[in-house]
Protein backbone atom coordinates (compact mmCIF):
# COMPACT_ATOMS: atom_id res chain seq x y z
CA UNK A 1 0.00 0.00 0.00
CA UNK A 2 2.86 2.41 0.73
CA UNK A 3 4.99 1.26 -2.26
CA UNK A 4 7.50 -0.43 0.06
CA UNK A 5 8.12 -4.01 -1.02
CA UNK A 6 6.94 -6.31 1.75
CA UNK A 7 7.91 -9.70 0.38
CA UNK A 8 9.16 -11.80 3.28
CA UNK A 9 8.24 -9.09 5.83
CA UNK A 10 6.00 -11.38 7.85
CA UNK A 11 8.43 -14.28 7.56
CA UNK A 12 11.15 -12.05 9.02
CA UNK A 13 8.81 -11.06 11.86
CA UNK A 14 8.04 -14.71 12.67
CA UNK A 15 11.74 -15.60 12.55
CA UNK A 16 12.52 -12.75 14.98
CA UNK A 17 9.58 -13.61 17.28
CA UNK A 18 9.27 -17.43 17.38
CA UNK A 19 5.88 -18.57 18.64
CA UNK A 20 4.28 -15.12 18.39
CA UNK A 21 1.70 -16.81 16.15
CA UNK A 22 0.85 -20.35 17.26
CA UNK A 23 -1.43 -21.40 14.37
CA UNK A 24 -1.73 -20.06 10.83
CA UNK A 25 -4.86 -21.39 9.11
CA UNK A 26 -5.11 -21.29 5.34
CA UNK A 27 -8.07 -22.55 3.33
CA UNK A 28 -6.79 -23.17 -0.15
CA UNK A 29 -5.64 -26.39 -1.74
CA UNK A 30 -5.82 -28.19 -5.05
CA UNK A 31 -4.73 -31.60 -3.89
CA UNK A 32 -5.44 -34.52 -1.58
CA UNK A 33 -4.54 -34.71 2.13
CA UNK A 34 -1.64 -37.13 1.51
CA UNK A 35 0.12 -34.97 -1.06
CA UNK A 36 3.39 -33.17 -0.45
CA UNK A 37 5.11 -30.49 -2.50
CA UNK A 38 8.78 -29.69 -2.07
CA UNK A 39 8.85 -31.99 0.95
CA UNK A 40 6.05 -30.03 2.64
CA UNK A 41 2.68 -31.41 3.69
CA UNK A 42 -0.63 -29.77 4.59
CA UNK A 43 0.61 -29.27 8.16
CA UNK A 44 4.06 -27.78 8.72
CA UNK A 45 5.92 -26.17 11.62
CA UNK A 46 8.38 -23.29 11.25
CA UNK A 47 9.34 -20.26 13.37
CA UNK A 48 7.32 -21.68 16.26
CA UNK A 49 4.16 -21.53 14.12
CA UNK A 50 2.04 -24.39 12.78
CA UNK A 51 0.84 -23.71 9.23
CA UNK A 52 -2.31 -25.69 8.38
CA UNK A 53 -4.05 -26.02 5.06
CA UNK A 54 -7.48 -26.58 6.55
CA UNK A 55 -9.95 -26.96 3.71
CA UNK A 56 -10.90 -27.22 0.08
CA UNK A 57 -14.61 -27.01 -0.49
CA UNK A 58 -14.44 -27.42 -4.23
CA UNK A 59 -14.65 -30.45 -6.45
CA UNK A 60 -14.72 -29.21 -10.01
CA UNK A 61 -12.14 -26.39 -10.02
CA UNK A 62 -9.28 -28.78 -10.81
CA UNK A 63 -11.16 -32.10 -11.01
CA UNK A 64 -8.15 -34.42 -11.27
CA UNK A 65 -6.49 -33.19 -8.09
CA UNK A 66 -9.05 -31.22 -6.09
CA UNK A 67 -11.31 -32.87 -3.56
CA UNK A 68 -13.60 -31.39 -0.93
CA UNK A 69 -12.14 -31.74 2.55
CA UNK A 70 -12.09 -29.84 5.82
CA UNK A 71 -10.35 -30.08 9.17
CA UNK A 72 -11.65 -30.12 12.71
CA UNK A 73 -9.37 -28.61 15.37
CA UNK A 74 -10.14 -29.72 18.93
CA UNK A 75 -8.79 -27.64 21.81
CA UNK A 76 -9.06 -28.64 25.48
CA UNK A 77 -8.91 -25.93 28.14
CA UNK A 78 -5.57 -26.13 29.96
CA UNK A 79 -3.91 -28.37 27.36
CA UNK A 80 -1.14 -27.38 24.94
CA UNK A 81 -2.20 -30.13 22.53
CA UNK A 82 -4.50 -29.55 19.54
CA UNK A 83 -6.08 -32.50 17.74
CA UNK A 84 -6.37 -31.95 13.97
CA UNK A 85 -8.72 -34.28 12.07
CA UNK A 86 -9.39 -34.40 8.33
CA UNK A 87 -12.88 -34.96 6.89
CA UNK A 88 -13.33 -36.03 3.27
CA UNK A 89 -16.65 -34.81 1.85
CA UNK A 90 -16.60 -37.27 -1.07
CA UNK A 91 -15.18 -40.73 -1.70
CA UNK A 92 -12.96 -39.79 -4.66
CA UNK A 93 -9.70 -40.19 -2.65
CA UNK A 94 -10.76 -42.53 0.17
CA UNK A 95 -14.09 -43.46 1.77
CA UNK A 96 -16.14 -40.37 2.64
CA UNK A 97 -15.84 -39.39 6.28
CA UNK A 98 -13.04 -38.97 8.79
CA UNK A 99 -9.62 -39.76 7.31
CA UNK A 100 -7.43 -41.06 10.18
CA UNK A 101 -4.26 -41.17 8.08
CA UNK A 102 -4.18 -37.35 8.01
CA UNK A 103 -4.88 -36.87 11.75
CA UNK A 104 -2.22 -35.00 13.71
CA UNK A 105 -1.64 -33.83 17.27
CA UNK A 106 0.04 -30.43 17.50
CA UNK A 107 1.96 -29.28 20.56
CA UNK A 108 1.62 -25.56 21.23
CA UNK A 109 4.16 -23.63 23.29
CA UNK A 110 1.55 -22.81 25.95
CA UNK A 111 -1.77 -24.26 27.12
CA UNK A 112 -5.02 -23.21 25.51
CA UNK A 113 -7.29 -21.09 27.74
CA UNK A 114 -10.96 -20.18 27.22
Regions found by a protein language model. Give the residues of each.
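Active-site-proximal segments of metal-dependent phosphoesterases and phosphodiesterases across multiple
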Residues: 1-22, 34
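Proline-centered loop/turn at the N-terminus of a beta-strand
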Residues: 22-23, 50
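Active-site glycine-centered loops adjacent to acidic/histidine catalytic or metal-binding residues
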Residues: 27-28
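Binuclear metal-dependent phosphoesterase catalytic core
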Residues: 32-114
Amino acid sequence: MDSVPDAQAFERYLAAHPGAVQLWLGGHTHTNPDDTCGGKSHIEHKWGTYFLNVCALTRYHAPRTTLPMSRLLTFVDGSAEVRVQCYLHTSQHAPQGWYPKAERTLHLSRPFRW
